Amino acid sequence: MARILRGEIRWADLNPVRGKEQAGNRPVLILSHDVFNERSGTVIAVALTSHPQRAAFPLTLELQSGDLPKKSWVKISQIRTLSIERIGSRVGRALPEEVAQIVDGFNEIIGT
């Protein structure tokens, strides 16, 4: 498999899930650094959705990246550690400013 890089949007198999976790085969945005992804065999990612979101930042962020096939929102509260075995092909890439804003949103949610 090609290297999995921070800021990439890739397909991922999120099943099995519990409760209100995002399910299914869906795009995720990779937040973890490249070296972590390569050495750990896992990635830290957040789920994306194409359904318009009522919740605002810091819970969600609309992506402005032009290379996605659909308008998409990052569900910042839906962060997961995933085995690289769950990660599929590349869909697109988030702008570096978007990745930074998502990390800021996550920090706001957890209270740092």
Q: Which ranges hold each PLM region?
A:
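Conserved functional hotspots at enzyme active or ligand-binding sites that engage polyanionic ligands
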Residues: 1-112
